[in-house]
Amino acid sequence: MHLFKKVYSLLLIILLTNCEAKAAILVPNLIVDINQLPSKNYDIGPFIISWNAQLLQFDITNQSDLSKSIWSSVQEKGFIHGAQAIDMVEDSRGSFVFEEEIIEILSNQSIENIDLINNQLVIKGKVYNNAVQTAYTLIFKSNGDNQLNFDVNFENNTFNRVYFTYSAEEEEAFYGFGEQCSFFNNKGKKIPIWVNEQGVGRGDITDPIINAVLGLSGGNETSNYISVPHYISTSNRSLYLENTNYSVFDLTESDKVQIDTWSSHLVGNIISGNSPKELITEYTTYSGRMRKLPSWVGEGAIIGLQGGTEKLYDEWAALEEKGTPIAAFWVQDWIGQRTTIVGKQLWWNWELDNDRYPNWDELVDTLGKKNIRLLGYINPFIANIYGQKTNIRRNIFLEARTNGFLVKKENGDPYLIKQTSFDAGIIDLTNPACRVWIKEIIKDELIARGLKGWMADFAEALPYDAVLFSGESPKDYHNKYTEVWMQINREAIEESGYGDEMVFFARSGFTQSPKYSTLFWQGDQLVDWGQNDGIKSAMTGLMSAGISGFSLNHSDIGGYTTVTYPIVKNYVRSKELLKRWIEMSAFTTVFRTHEGLNPDKNYQIFDSDETLEHFAKYAKIYKSWRFYREQLIDEANSTGIPVIRHPYLEFPNDLKTQDIVFEQFMIGSEFMVAPVLEKNKVQTNIYLPNGRWINLWDGTILSSNGQSFTITNLVDKPAVFYKENSTNGIQFRNNLIDEGLAE
């Protein structure tokens, strides 16, 4: 019966989702007395807002280019309407499903006043139906030379839905919204803005038994760790929200956009720019830009391993024998490892396990003499492991509960989140004393132990009905939680005095996470070839997140999520997948391995001499373009432009680049990379924009008129080309020749 309920619930969710996706966008009727409000232009700093009384339309331009509209309402239709609704939100282990019951829909809009007051355009009127109404105010004001702020507020806040509707062009593509992993162009989709567990499979797993077991944890094509209310479009338009509550960008119709925010107050900014890179640079003045990585990160591979001191020494020796450049060892099980129903997980009690890693100080010192760092792991959960783990010195869960540092339920009890086969409390980051306490744990238990960085995991699971110390609504704080988690980690390394030399990498993110985090990684991809949750999704998400300011990002080499249930199809890492992920990752910002959720089932780099040599080769290739990577990291820090780029950013006038989803990417402005992302393939297609391109491996030249080429004989390498006359391309190729890695 329990299984039947799960299957029924899953089918119901799918049905509701599909029905919702087919619903037409409701555009409100607009009532205006044009005799009282005739056509007029309003100067708002560098912007001109034009009211056309005949078309019943607002249009906004920047005075730097009066021919280009950066925002316009739909002709003869309203642009604001509202509703009163009841939230119906279900969550499980950081996965959420949002539904609502609409009580009243206010489908008519009136405009009663348009006034220029203190260089702000103030528009007032009502949204209403035959029975109820509320007054609204919309204020436009300049936010610098390239941003126009808009602020919509309902007088009666029982109407807790604001809908903001405006026009789009038929062929306009929309990019961004954080780390969208299933598609790069979001046109035709509804994009929810909510930091989430991305889910297992996200639609790639078709086995009904697995999906029934997963339930909400299966995810869907729009559930993502990094969710940001921001986009750029191929019409060189851009917009972002300042709201932190749940919202939806409805792009399902070709000629309009509708933003649905679950609030009575909507605040955002419209960005003006002449190119996609200009739009990103302007946006990141708000989101923040990522600081430069410590130089040691680029010196070689970051090796993810578990198993203790002796195993680390053994695997280090094997890597050294192959001449593998190593930047760090990442030992996520520094706190000890537990076996759960899904595989190998960790004891979430943030102190060193001296039994698993004896002679720790000696290990740190020995690695340090070879210029190799040691990295660890932490997250904002705390598990009560008393009586389960025998060698604990601190009961961190007890400390948190005693001091009131855990998020609570309405009855005052700690809100325990079900993980796999254990529960964990989530620390309350709205409590200033808790923030000091967790920072001291990071300083005392991680930094003082010699760790030079760590994975700062999770931060997606704050429940919708939680009770917070500050009294803030979790509906507004949920997305902020990940930003604050990044901020605390950043403050800990800065206050320790080692800030420039340390790096932590996070998987979750909201609008201003790039301001605080030193690095991102893409979370838990399935160890598969899928487009929704596999190697392809990692490539799509990497390029998508770069649009929204996540300029330094990478994925686990080989993927992470392993599915090993009896009877049904298993998902375990193959040697071929591991090798292809190695090849792809060598051309991204960070080259880091992960054993995966079930290390004994997944193929590892140490499982054969062939894969160990392959890994060593690509670690050398990764190191060989360090000189250019550092230039791009500097550029990301000063402009917000990502290191790894979708080709559209460099070739915005080439319409063919808009069709690229995961198939290829650019390193900076000079290299085009097309990894092999299909099983049992040794060739791939690569689109090269107009010009002459040089093959990195053999120096042959391809002259392109803006066309695709089939590149063959890619048994153990991706297709990589650089622009003719690129000095960085020449240096990279010469470095490879010196290493014996290119002809």
Go through the PLM ranges and name each one.
Residues H2-L10:
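Sec-dependent signal peptide recognition
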